[in-house]
């Protein structure tokens, strides 16, 4: 049976000397693994079109088990992501998070729309790091946890101007007048907590303007990665590469 589906490549694995296995997240929100024969041979015409982040119309045959890719009508190669190692790494963090948030046979149209949205925003020049924060925030509940950013979890005060950090002891933001109760709380500005709350709750189709200072994005990114580590025991391969890049920059 020949199948045609739009999708985005979220994973690639080399298979033997010349083949590879790709996984696309298709337009219906399903993960589809495909064998690509002779993918690493330039003459096959599939080498460039089966890279990570490629968005296109995938034509493949499938009877039982894994399908076999026949051709790709590329809509957007997202080539710019391969020109900047930081953008590529943060985009990889987006795909890795979405991939791991879904069961192998699960279907999530929202996941496809989220990935399509963030890759489009990165292409428009929006910070790839910021987009990774958006993905991590939107996927939290799929990993079995959530985070409270909009009020003090100790006093229940909703005065966000008084928030000074995130407490893993009390599982949420804390305000300055009770900060002494957790001296190990993760310190960050109330503006960062406010923006985390907005990005967590705001539907992606309402995120028209996304301009946040780099320092605040760094704070947000550091906290959400820590949240995944503490609450879900999650370690991301992409984040490991990002950390290595920053260490090299600081040598």
From Swiss-Prot:
InterPro entries: ARFGAP/RecO, DNA_rep/recomb_RecO_N, NA-bd_OB-fold, RecO. Keywords: DNA damage, DNA recombination, DNA repair. GO terms for cellular component: bacterial nucleoid. It comes from the Bacteria. GO terms for biological process: DNA recombination; double-strand break repair. It holds the Pfam family RecO_N. The keyword DNA damage applies. NCBIfam families: reco. PANTHER family: DNA REPAIR PROTEIN RECO. Belongs to the RecO family. Involved in DNA repair and RecF pathway recombination. This is DNA repair protein RecO. It comes from Staphylococcus saprophyticus subsp. saprophyticus (strain ATCC 15305 / DSM 20229 / NCIMB 8711 / NCTC 7292 / S-41). The gene is recO.
